[in-house]
């Protein structure tokens, strides 16, 4: 099949056949990187890295991906270093970026901002996180990580632990997992439960869903996806302080599981995932970060119409 998505804005845009194609192409890219490390598929192409919200991993992952493909990067980090701080609209900023770059990657604190950005320009736009909305490239690399670690998706039980209300990585990955025969366990405080809009979006798909506040439900799961409590999204800091330490994953909890539960985390972590888990063979979050580069290399090529 061919890839027909110029932009990567949310996970709803991908069908099951799109995902099957992407997983195959990411595997192909992984093999290429193992042999050559870097190559010139995107020589002469320029990526605009527009991060108006804090990021280390995602920004460096995209920039490393472009550099490994032979392309180059121009960047801006934070509102204070951009003309937006002077009152320029995102639309006008994107029109200027279009004059400089062949593709834009944008992170922005306002949900839906990537669609505004894409609507302003003809170059491809990739959403690297829009507020509490979505983070589609993280979801694609997470999906690839699960398949790489477990060999399949169908039949797996996957736990999402922590901030399911504001966690955009969770929102995005759940939208992809709905295409597979999986059992989802949503483990969170009631106050941070998955929004109803996302649960409604799962209706009619082959997965099953269970919500609980019991952290020991992770013992029933093949995969545990742990996230930090999103302090920056809370309107009331006291509420954050009350909830931040309710769910913690440590080695003792994981070793008590009946299954060899693979542990994922989009990072950064605070104190929801103990460092004593790091030396377990099923702690996959650092491998997950490595999969991110080849996943984004693949998406950059496909968005620019460059097959490999």
From Swiss-Prot:
Record family assignment: Belongs to the aspartate/ornithine carbamoyltransferase superfamily. ATCase family.
Record PANTHER family: ASPARTATE CARBAMOYLTRANSFERASE (PTHR45753:SF6), ORNITHINE CARBAMOYLTRANSFERASE, MITOCHONDRIAL (PTHR45753)
Enzyme class, broadest EC rank: transferase
Subunit note: Heterododecamer (2C3:3R2) of six catalytic PyrB chains organized as two trimers (C3), and six regulatory PyrI chains organized as three dimers (R2).
Known catalytic reactions: carbamoyl phosphate + L-aspartate = N-carbamoyl-L-aspartate + phosphate + H(+)
Protein name as annotated: Aspartate carbamoyltransferase catalytic subunit
Binding site for carbamoyl phosphate: 57-58, 107, 135, 138, 267-268
Residues the entry annotates as binding L-aspartate: 86, 168, 228
